[in-house]
Amino acid sequence: MVSSKQTQLKKGKQPSWIEMYLPKEVRPYAHLARLDKPIGSWLLAWPAFWSVALAADLESLPKMLAIFGWWAVWIRGAGCTINDYFDRNFDKKVERTKSRPLASGAVSPAQGLWWLAFQLFIGLGVLYQFNVLTLALAIVHVPFVFAYPLMKRITYWPQAFLGVMISWGALLGSSALKGSVVPSIAYPLYISSFFWTLVYDTIYAHQDKVDDAKAGIKSTALRFGDATKMWISWFGVGCIAALVIGGLILNIGLPYYVFVAIATGQLVWQIFTVDLLSPLDCGKKFVSNQWFGAIIFTGILLGRLFP
């Protein structure tokens, strides 16, 4: 039998750290949680990190970032697992996804559900140290995580639902530190993250648009078609406008706006240079969004340090 490492080498791919360092029995579960592809965890974590950076004092900041980073890794893994569970029959028809553990049979549906329960337990467990509101918000978030994969079957706007779900950390960060969802902190960040998600996940959806159309999977990529760049340009405007308005409300220092300007340039670069006919380029532009999140986070910190 050819090992997964040998198969990857034959396809011209370098084996990930999962193949190199994890026991064979564990590898399918690590792949199911996309532990070798951290971009999804970053995208879930950044709204929480932004909110924490605005709400926390410098002494508590490292601990809070570690807690929400842990939460993001495991909840994102749970989201990938439930997505693959619901989509396992569709994934078999899509070139990019047919080798996923549930689609390929490396993990059975029952095993996938047990793995899902474990990830939710670990991800939510770390939040038990916070107030009741924060824990309640985290629990309310879970049905949105479960529902997202189903949206691709009923609407051409699943990316909007993803924006609602993946921006949740903006609410949790202020709640955990302030005891309530502080509107001046949480709402501008949530709105900005929502529009940002519409930009990057529409680009992401263009990778699979041909296979998705054949399989009956809906997306904004298929909805917008040749008008995609116009649509995501307006979403980008909404994202940046919310960040600027939030900064003005909180009276954040000048460095924040400098970094928002840099992030704007990064977003403009994505939108105007992405080749929507190239799955490879769409994937690269999607992954580059980890840097957009980092730029905004840096701007928030410096804006608070140098008001």
Swiss-Prot record:
Outcome of swapping D212E: Reduces activity 97%
EC top class named in words: transferase
Annotated Gene3D superfamilies: UbiA prenyltransferase
Transport recorded as keyword: no
TM stretches of this protein: 38-58, 62-82, 120-140, 154-174, 179-199, 230-250, 252-272, 286-306
GO MF assignments: (2E,6E)-farnesyl diphosphate synthase activity; 4-hydroxybenzoate geranyltransferase activity
Effect of K229A: Reduces activity 87% and decreases affinity for geranyl diphosphate 3-fold
Protein topology in the membrane: Multi-pass membrane protein
Keywords in alphabetical order: Endoplasmic reticulum, Magnesium, Membrane, Transferase, Transmembrane, Transmembrane helix
Expression across tissues: Expressed only in roots.
GO biological process, one term: ubiquinone biosynthetic process
UniProt key word Transmembrane: yes
Known EC number: 2.5.1.93
InterPro entries for the chain: HB_polyprenyltransferase-like, Prenyltransferase, UbiA_prenyltransferase, UbiA_prenylTrfase_CS, UbiA_sf
Gene name of the encoded protein: PGT-1
Impact after mutating D208E: Reduces activity 99%
Protein name per UniProt: 4-hydroxybenzoate geranyltransferase 1
Effect of D91A: Loss of activity
Effect of Q207A: Reduces activity 97%
A GO cellular component entry from the record: endoplasmic reticulum membrane
Species name: Lithospermum erythrorhizon
Function: Prenyltransferase involved in the biosynthesis of shikonin, a naphthoquinone secondary metabolite. Could accept only geranyl diphosphate and not dimethylallyl diphosphate, farnesyl diphosphate, or geranylgeranyl diphosphate as substrate.
Pfam hit, one: UbiA
Family label: Belongs to the UbiA prenyltransferase family.
Reported effect, D208 to A/N: Loss of activity
Cofactor(s) for this UniProt protein: Mg(2+)
